[in-house]
Amino acid sequence: MEGQEDYQLLYEGRRSQPAPEEQEASALPRGRRQRGVEAGEGSVGREEARGHRRSQHRDRLGGGSMGSNVIGLPGVNPPTSEVVVLEPRSFDEMAQVIQYLRERKTVIMNLTLMDPAEAQRSVDFVAGGTYAIDGHQERIGENIFLFTPSTVTVSTPSSQGMPPLQRPLQSPTPLWPSGYEHLQAVGQH
């Protein structure tokens, strides 16, 4: 409350007797009057009062440092990221993919339902759009691609200094006989 009382005294003291510059300025036309008062010494007191109020406000919020003018807004949450998973059937759907990227949404495209030539054309088109918005692209599987806007960073094990996962060159041998071999063995007994 002490700050509010100081403000009241400062405000009442400033308004009770107009400064000589304000009296002179009232005789000037309106546009010149505003500029003259702002440039005159009367504005220095107002600026000091504003600075005093700002520092009190900062102290109340607990951010007494002069280096930051950023304050948090209560009730405002940061925007959430959205991932869109698509299985397009034709090249005509690629314009919508670009729109998702422009809206800062991550897109995963599964192109297994498309003709291979049209799928290649689609990937090239979306890759060009992704490049234009400084986005990122990654192939994450056979005919499956990840496209992200510039606000999303894609990291892979190799980019983090971890060894990449080793994939087997051939399918593992089963530990039990397949059903067909088992049927042959039963028929021979």
Swiss-Prot record:
Pfam families recorded: SepF
Domain of life: Bacteria
InterPro entries given in the database record: Cell_div_SepF, Cell_div_SepF/SepF-rel, SepF-like_sf
Protein family per UniProt: Belongs to the SepF family.
Subunit structure, interactors included: Homodimer. Interacts with FtsZ.
Biological function: Cell division protein that is part of the divisome complex and is recruited early to the Z-ring. Probably stimulates Z-ring formation, perhaps through the cross-linking of FtsZ protofilaments. Its function overlaps with FtsA.
Name of protein: Cell division protein SepF
